[in-house]
Amino acid sequence: MDPLETQELVGKSPTDSSKQALPISEQDQGRQSSETCARASPLSIFMEPFQWLQMLSSQLNPTFIFGVVVVYGLSQGFSGSFFKVVTDFYWKDVQKVQPSAVQLYIGLYYIPWVMKPIWGLLTDVFPVRGYKRRPYFLVAGVLGCVSALMVATLGKVPIAVALSCLIGITAGVAIADVTIDACIAKNSIEIRSLAPDMQSLCGICSSLGALIGYSSSGFFASLVLLAVPPTILIVLGFVIYEVRSTTLQSEKKKDLQIALRGMSKTIKLPQVWKPSLYMYLSLALSISTHEGQFYWYTYPKAGPAFSQEFVGMIYAVGALASIAGVLIYQKTLKDYPFRSLLLYAQLLYGMTGMLDVIFFLRWNLVIGIPDYFFVIMEECVSRIISRIRWIPMIVLSTRLCPLGIEGTFFALLMCIDSLGSLSSKWGGGIVLHLFHVTRTDFTNLWLAILIRNFLRFATIGLIFLVPKGDQEDDLIPPDILTANSDASLDDDGLELAPVKETSEEARLLLDEENSLKLK
């Protein structure tokens, strides 16, 4: 909203009638002045993201912002993207595994993510020396660093050993993710209007980290680089601000019982299990055929024979497109209701999947579009749509979390999403195996992709499971939302910056801060 409009809506009073009676010429001058302000200088446009970050830091603790940057930017963004490219070539060129088998192995990467409720439960009710968040950042960093150094220095090892090390890397990322997500969920409940902004910050950090990771993966194939983000997680565990908990050992059992009882009661609500079921099915039914496609477009005798450097560049451009998707959501879509937004996002998601069929059948060459241009265009479109589809589901998840067990319950919802991703990988692996897609035979790959696209369109029929509410609405009853707030909430995790205003004053303050947001 324009700052002038905000002031009119917030500060308008009956005494403003004199302002409404201004002569036409003065109104024209005021309109011209506002139009001049609207035509912002390049410097002001450049400063908008920094002003947005300043606004978030003023409402949230700055070390929380730093934690989001480290976890989402480095641990998930950089490490996840670099990991994806390097391990794909590792399984293909070093271990020489069939694509359907790689799909099953990649599905095992999601085991630490499926265990997120356990990590969330630990962070909520089992503080270490009085701290609920710091120790788990340290554990995540040490686990990820040791696993990365092992797989990087041991060379070619048995598949079981390599798989264990790679799962260890993803476990470090998952533990760090659930720890920072607990803070995000808590802040999203306490300052509802900032929930979309926090998810936009996560998305931008993740995309920027992915851009760096994909760009470097084509030229630096060493797995040693995967030890860098966990090392910074260790640093984060020492510097992040957290109030020390005063919970006694005898109270931990009570908190655990409250958490389990609260989770059981909340997940049974139709307002919760219906959108959770939709999120699972929307991921599981979109079966993954990535490994079959990867083997095809890097195989010289069948596909376009892309090099590792070009594959990294494709994903890097896709990371830029992901940032564009975040900006599109932040500027135009964050105020739309959940159901209508996810309906159109899923429809576009199915339509973009048909680009893979066109590429595999080489119809792009028939119409004169080179492979390298078409694949980059397809990557950009699919990344933008995927990001627009994904962010509302994360915001929806934060709106379903009750206070006091927000870390545990958000982890449970993310566990459901991880189960959906695991089902997608394994389902895709089974389809690739049934259609006899191997390292050298890709005859039926297009049929597997076509089935995937059909399932994406079929998911639209489940959209009734998504609530119609806006992205700032309370989706669960107030008694459930605050039922667990006595579970050591007074010393829970990362603190918000102290805000003493009443609810009305806080609303006016946020209205004024809207002028600093990315628009």
Residue ranges and their predicted role:
Residues 109-117, 193-221, 315-319, 414-427:
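Glycine-rich segments within core transmembrane alpha-helices of 12-TM secondary carriers
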Residues 112-120, 311-336, 345-357, 421-424:
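Transmembrane alpha-helices of Major Facilitator/SLC transporters
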Residues 1-64, 146, 152-163, 171, ...:
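Intracellular loop-helix junctions on the cytosolic face of multi-pass helical membrane proteins
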Residues 99-100, 189-202, 308-309, 373, ...:
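Loop-to-transmembrane helix entry/capping segments in MFS-fold secondary transporters
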